[in-house]
């Protein structure tokens, strides 16, 4: 056995963060490999990136499957994968998604001499608000089989009280030969939240998301139009309660008018409606919305903007440390474009060597950073700005309160429409039921039965 196998539930051309990171590792390592993955036909595809990855893929095992994180889907990927793969001296798997680690575990148990590298992108058990990311593992047959192996090794046993993702972390920590984390805080959080005792001190490494060679930034030229009379800022990605983009909005609102007029914001996101509620009217007028784009076009486009914005997730009160290192950072580094990192205090991103860094919920610091960026880009002398933070926060709160009120009005209006539609549906359903009842009464009536022979005669003369 000499060949290496990549086990990745999502893999190029399927367009996900995980499949792109796996593709980047393959392109950086430049070694021939085999791959086993799921088809995931309903997820967007990126065939341009696949063309470059295929240079190193000798054999690809494709398991027909729709995307699902349910146990039946995981089990299917595991069972079907085991029918296809054999003869590998080294395997590599990456989660998210846990399907990959479960299949890798199965192969390792059946081939103990195989070296297994297992990478974790993020903590798998909990997310914000202590919310579980998966359901309970209720497959008693699987639990019983694994527990026999764990008992032989003197390990704690799993049960139907454990989450699927929890079992994935625990078993991977035990049986993998090498554990890969993207950063130290991620490791600390995962070990802290795991309800089992396991020591991985001798087999873990840190490996941040890879940055591709410069040639890949020129592989797919983008024809996206930029007006060089302005300073063009770009943000790629989504927003959610713990990554809100609020700090950029607040900074923009408190810089000088001449700098505001020079800014153009370009958003590549599926969250247009959310951004439209968040942005102020002035900033919204200076913003261009775009859908997500293919990965290689994104790399090329990242070289064309003046500033790339990346923001930490706000994790205080949710984790002992911030375990997340935005994957965009590795791509931005290769672009040679100015990066503005809006960080959480003491996060992994805050420790990186980035010229422009500011911090979440630090209004004066964010304003000062944006002011510095604009002065540098316009070749102007930096001027000090005076901010009445309390007054601004009142204004911003009023603005957001009004937006919330507008959204409530929209929701109530849509709800009333739904009520009207439901009433109409109920009315039509009642009419149909009455017609069916009348029809049934006619068919069962004596007059209908008596005239049966006459109807037959009538058909003959037609």
Can you annotate each of these PLM segments?
Residues 82-100, 112-119:
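Short N-terminal targeting/anchoring amphipathic segment
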